[in-house]
Swiss-Prot record:
Record protein name field: Cis-3-hydroxy-L-proline dehydratase
Cofactor note: Binds 1 Mg(2+) ion per subunit.
Alphabetical list of InterPro entries matching this protein: Cis-3-h-L-Pro_dehydratase (IPR034620), DgoD-like (IPR034593), Enolase-like_C_sf (IPR036849), Enolase-like_N (IPR029017), Enolase_C-like (IPR029065), HProlDhtase (IPR054855), Mandelate_racemase_C (IPR013342), Mandelate_racemase_N_dom (IPR013341)
Keyword terms: Lyase, Magnesium, Metal-binding
Job of this protein: Catalyzes the dehydration of cis-3-hydroxy-L-proline (c3LHyp) to Delta(1)-pyrroline-2-carboxylate (Pyr2C). May be involved in a degradation pathway that converts c3LHyp to L-proline, which would allow S.novella to grow on c3LHyp as a sole carbon source.
UniProt superkingdom: Bacteria
Length: 367
């Protein structure tokens, strides 16, 4: 089997809440997502999706996905899509960096492998380690009381895990954490995610001020070294995200005891092949993970569900149902949240089928 063509569609994903705010005044109102098809000479097509969180979260941006596909796409024509390690080594050899560009090609090839073998992707990633996956809800940055009201609403929908978007004014962030923790049950989980928005001094102060609360601190500062400094000064459980972008940074962080949990975003590390490797390293080292992506719709959510379902429950800290945040359905067969959980399809591959009437005409055609 050989890859014969690649297509990509641009699709807007408006938000039910209207706007998503995070640290340093960043926000998105309509996410720009790219749906990718990898076509083969066997008549089997695999699908994937990549949706960066704006252009200020990681070294990635929405237009870059499609520009990158124009660059790397012709160089994977003729490769066997089921030889996933060979494919990934080739992509790394012809385009340095840009893992988010390579991710949808890799994921679409996992979809192909599942369709060829007649197995769901979670079986290929290790099997059904858990039947349903616990979800968290991200709470867009607003005034403390407004965030607390949103948590109360989502708690009524079945969520028990919440990621609070902080990384603004330090005093307000302390209030955000305190006010929201007060309305949660003792068994509920609260993560204060600064998305690199604090200085080291601010992070140290905030961690000390909320030291009496049951709260996780996530990615307080921009650099690994700053985060490591804050980690050494707090007893609060610690999550790293933005600075864990591959096997190398993961291994260093494990050696340095830099975190208790990592946030494993599939497109950030280059797709399912590399995410599976990092997942397995985390399991072997006893490190739980939030398994998710930067953003997306139905196809991203399906991809998350397959990796999370194949991860042992004790190492699956949480995952994300991004398709419940938006107003547009782009694929049939995607996971749907039930009482704060989701699961992956048992159909071959990712178990989804794009809704082409929504996608329209492709904006990238290669091959």
């Amino acid at each position: 089997m050989k890859i014969t063509g690649i297509k990509a569609w641009k699709v807007g994903l408006p938000l039910k809440e209207g706007r998503y705010n995070w640290s340093n005044g960043n926000f998105v109102e309509v996410f720009d997502s790219t749906v990718v098809a990898v076509e083969t000479d066997a008549g089997i097509t695999g699908y994937a999706e990549c949706c960066p969180l704006g252009s200020a979260y990681l070294p990635a941006y929405a237009h870059g996905v499609r520009a990158g596909l124009e660059e790397i796409g012709p160089k994977v024509i003729g490769l066997d899509p089921t030889d996933l390690n060979v494919l990934n080594r080739h992509m790394d050899s012809v385009l340095r960096g840009h893992p988010y560009v390579k991710a949808p090609i890799d994921i679409a090839c996992w979809d192909i492998l599942g369709k060829v073998s007649g197995l769901p992707v979670y079986k290929l990633l290790g099997g059904a380690a858990q039947e349903k996956v616990a979800l968290y809800r991200a709470i867009s940055q607003e005034a403390p009381e407004a965030m607390a009201r949103k948590i109360a609403g989502y708690k009524a929908e079945g969520y028990t895990k919440f990621q609070l978007k902080v990384g603004g004014d330090a005093d307000q962030d302390i209030d955000r954490i305190r006010v929201t923790r007060e309305i949660l049950d003792a068994t509920d989980t609260l993560v204060a995610d600064a998305n690199t928005g604090w200085t080291r001094a601010e992070a140290a102060r905030i961690a000390a001020e909320v030291g009496d609360l049951d709260v996780y601190i996530e990615q307080p500062c921009p650099t690994y070294e700053e985060c490591l400094s804050v980690r050494a000064r707090t007893a609060r459980p610690f999550v790293l995200d933005e600075v864990i972008d591959g096997v190398g940074t993961l291994m260093k962080a494990l050696a340095d005891d830099a975190m208790d949990i990592i946030n494993l975003k599939i497109s950030k590390v280059g797709g399912l092949t590399k995410a599976r490797l990092m997942r397995d390293i985390c399991v072997a080292s006893g490190t739980p993970m939030t398994i998710e992506d930067t953003w997306g719709g139905d196809i991203v959510t399906a991809t998350i569900a397959h990796l999370a379902r194949s991860t042992p429950e004790e190492f699956s800290f949480s995952a994300t149902d991004f398709n419940s945040y938006g107003t547009v359905d782009i694929a049939k067969g995607a996971p749907k949240r039930v009482n704060g959980f989701m699961t992956a399809s048992d159909a071959p591959g990712l178990g989804i089928e794009p809704i082409f009437e929504v996608l329209g005409e492709p904006v990238v055609v290669i091959g």
